[in-house]
Amino acid sequence: MTLQRTFVMIKPDGVRRRLVGEIISRFEKRGFNILALKMVHMDRATAERLYQEHKGKGFFNELINYIISGPVVCMIIEGDDAVSVVRKMIGATDPKEASPGTIRGDYALSKSENVIHASDSEEKAKTEMGIFFQDVTEIGAQARM
């Protein structure tokens, strides 16, 4: 097992439906530490930066408009094999394919309103954490004080 950090974001539908506490509780019960957390109302430029891999795809504008439609909760989560374990916990993007017991399996309404985003690699996690938390290296030290 490797101690890792990953980026997790509760999307506007998750915030609007008051699922923030339940979702955070699932990560804590699994033994993860929440190193940083903040609620933001993302602007278009930040949303486009976060989802730049989808630029040019048919759903890109719809995705960006949805992400900027309301506040999101951004977190840095730390724990053993955080990237892969968190991805398993959130479930498949399409709620029809997400297993019951996963966050999306239990709460997602559609492919677009699927409650949560999590980094899919360590490299992406570093990039995504850097978008919302400028000094990631400082965060770990502060969290352990």
Curated annotation (Swiss-Prot):
Enzyme class of the recorded protein, top EC level: transferase
Gene Ontology molecular function terms on file: ATP binding; metal ion binding; nucleoside diphosphate kinase activity
Active site: 117
EC code(s) of this entry: 2.7.4.6
Stated role: Major role in the synthesis of nucleoside triphosphates other than ATP. The ATP gamma phosphate is transferred to the NDP beta phosphate via a ping-pong mechanism, using a phosphorylated active-site intermediate.
Family: Belongs to the NDK family.
Protein name, per record: Nucleoside diphosphate kinase
